[in-house]
Amino acid sequence: MKRISLIALVTIMSGCTMLEPIETPEVVNATTVVDAVEGDKSKDESSGIVDTLRGRSDPVAGDPAWAPIHPKQQPEHYAAETGSLFSVNHLSNLYDDSKPRGVGDIITVTLDEKTNASKSANADLSKSNDSSMDPLEVGGQELKIDGKYNFSYNLTNSNNFTGDASAKQSNSISGYITVEVIEVLANGNLVIRGEKWLTLNTGDEYIRLSGTIRPDDISFDNTIASNRVSNARIQYSGTGTQQDMQEPGFLARFFNVSL
């Protein structure tokens, strides 16, 4: 009887060790693989008549679509007593470095983006027509109508068009933002995402960044340049009074569209 009880106990313990780790609520509620880069936009809703009139919704800090994803908690395994100080759970490679390689690891992105665009177009079109006909003569005499009008004419037409257009745009952003790894792809690349909020007197400013990086591009000081981020999404904007003053009112936008 004791042997049967012992076998049953060992079977139950073995089954518990083979169970999948329990996912924490923050992992379950976090973003999925599909919206890992751009964020979950299914819950974007207007916060009232103010957002409706100004035609936009301000982002908020602590958005679940931009929340960090922490590593899953591994279940505890009870190892058999061998009398040795060696533990497989604390094994590390002697030649390994400390670069981010797993979900939840932190990396600093150096923002150094500069773009310049210019375009110009010139158009110069002209067209002229000149047509004439001498009077008709019959028997050496001009053919006239009612003794006053002959069949001669002289027509001249000229059209000219000149157009000149040019457009220039330049943008630059520099700084730092620390993000976290939210997914490790099958080829070893890392999907990163993070945000930073700055609370000012009359509003908030935020920086959001997401994209995919290679571990080989990470420098020894755990930083990577923003131009090394693939499929990068960089947002730098603000909320509050200063941001509202930079945009035209809804009446101005209405009349601009109507005209």
Curated annotation (Swiss-Prot):
**Residues bearing a lipid moiety (N-palmitoyl cysteine):** C16
Gene Ontology molecular functions: cytoskeletal motor activity
- Tell me, what's a Pfam family for it? FlgH
Annotated signal peptide = 1-15
> Where are the S-diacylglycerol cysteine lipid anchors?
C16
Q: How does it sit in the membrane?
A: Lipid-anchor
Q: Per the UniProt entry, what is one GO biological process?
A: bacterial-type flagellum-dependent cell motility
Give the GO cellular component terms, alphabetically: bacterial-type flagellum basal body, distal rod, L ring; cell outer membrane
According to its UniProt record, where is this protein mainly located?
Answer: membrane
Q: Which PROSITE patterns match?
A: PROKAR_LIPOPROTEIN
Localization per Swiss-Prot or TrEMBL: Cell outer membrane; Bacterial flagellum basal body
- Judging by the UniProt lineage, the source's domain of life is Bacteria
Question: Which InterPro entries does the protein's record reference?
Answer: Flag_Lring
Which keywords does this chain's UniProt record carry? Bacterial flagellum, Cell outer membrane, Lipoprotein, Membrane, Palmitate, Signal
Q: What does the record give as the function of this protein?
A: Assembles around the rod to form the L-ring and probably protects the motor/basal body from shearing forces during rotation.
- Describe, as the record does, how this protein assembles with itself and its partners: The basal body constitutes a major portion of the flagellar organelle and consists of four rings (L,P,S, and M) mounted on a central rod.
Q: Which NCBIfam families match?
A: PRK00249.1-2
Cite the PANTHER family for this sequence: FLAGELLAR L-RING PROTEIN
Similarity remark:
Belongs to the FlgH family.
- Protein name (record): Flagellar L-ring protein
Tell me what organism the protein belongs to: Vibrio vulnificus (strain CMCP6)
Q: Which gene encodes it?
A: flgH
